[in-house]
Curated annotation (Swiss-Prot):
Lineage: Bacteria, Pseudomonadati, Pseudomonadota, Alphaproteobacteria, Hyphomicrobiales
Family stated for the protein in its record: Belongs to the UPF0178 family.
UniProt-listed Pfam families: DUF188 (PF02639)
NCBIfam families the UniProt entry points to: PRK00124.1
InterPro entries: UPF0178
PANTHER family named among the record's database cross-references: UPF0178 PROTEIN YAII (PTHR35146:SF1)
Protein name per UniProt: UPF0178 protein BH16190
Domain of life: Bacteria
Length: 148
């Protein structure tokens, strides 16, 4: 698993799934951050250059990689690279959905830039945490059934 560590609210849940299934997990960010002392967990600190964490993640995506990110452009890159991508709210991004999600994200950014939309995403809640855990468990189970 690869985690885009910037503002990831489900790290604790990821670590539990990592231990349950014995999955090597990389937590990637452009600055130092604390991590639990776990053999399966590896901290990756990249340069502070724009998108360097995203670039590292995409370079290390494999067919059976699960990437957790709330960054829609990164999710699109992961899907194109053949990885499985989940948001912290449990949304699965795949080839059939990522184009629409990316277009909607770009539209909302444009509207916000023009001052036409002032809303922001709703706060992260317990329901999101539960949906994420279910989606992550399902993704791991699917990959295991496929022989990974």
């Amino acid at each position: 698993m690869l985690i885009d560590a910037d503002s990831c609210p489900v790290k604790t849940e990821i670590y539990r799934v990592m231990n349950r299934y014995q999955l090597k997990t990389f937590v990637v960010a452009n600055r130092f951050f604390p991590l639990p002392d776990e053999a399966l967990l590896e901290r990756v600190v990249v340069s502070d250059k724009f998108d360097s964490a995203d670039d590292w993640i995409v370079e290390h995506v494999q067919e059976a990689s699960i990437v957790i990110t709330s960054d829609i452009p990164l999710a699109a890159r992961v899907v194109r690279a053949g990885g499985v991508c989940l948001s912290p709210t449990g949304r699965t991004f795949d080839a059939s959905s990522i184009g629409h999600v990316l277009a909607l994200r770009n539209l909302m950014n444009d509207l916000r830039g023009q001052g036409k939309v002032i809303s922001s995403p709703r706060p992260f809640c317990c329901k999101d945490r539960s949906a994420f855990l279910s989606a992550l468990d399902l993704a791991v189970q699917r990959l295991k059934r496929c022989g990974y």
